[in-house]
Amino acid sequence: SVFEVKNETIERYRQEVAALQERGVVIQSIICDGKSGLLDLFLDIPVQMCQFHQVKIIVRHLTRKPKSPAAQALRALSLTLTESTQAAFEAALARWYEQYAVFLNERSVNEKTGHSHYTHKRLRAAYNSLKRHLPWLFTCECFPELCIPNATNLLEGKFSEMKQLL
């Protein structure tokens, strides 16, 4: 049966995967967009975060034309994600951090309150997103026998076709 899901929730994903498994469906892997809480929900199933969605997250934080050299370099690095291996990407991200750590960790003081805060919040958010998602960005490399795609693009194209048929 087909039904429309109004709101995607982590609990809904858990229920639907369990329902599929109860029907005897063997789920070899899950490819997702990085929805908070979803990446570490299925500990017994390989989960690949869509690399394209990760790039979109970076662009959302940094814009398409970032101003600072650090943000420009991080955006450029993120654009190599889909062509990189895990080892190469992690090494490049570590080099980026070495070069820009001081800038990334700069703090400013609010003159009214006297409290300090990170000066480059959006850059930190972009970098932290990459660091946080690294364990799931290259799952496809860890399980070559499963032929896991690195992005959801193929799936989203199929969903568009199905929606037109409904």
Q: Which residue ranges define each predicted feature?
A:
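Active-site beta-loop-alpha junctions of metal-dependent nucleic acid enzymes
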Residues: 2-25, 29
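Short, flexible loop/turn elements at secondary-structure junctions
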Residues: 4-7, 34, 56, 159
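Short, amphipathic alpha-helical segments
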Residues: 7-11, 32, 49-52, 83, ...
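Surface-exposed beta-strand edges and their flanking turn/coil or helix-capping segments
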Residues: 14-18, 62-65, 73, 153
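Acidic/histidine-rich catalytic cores and adjacent linkers
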Residues: 22-42, 75-166
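Conserved beta-strand -> loop -> alpha-helix junction used to position metal-binding or nucleic-acid-contacting
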Residues: 29-75
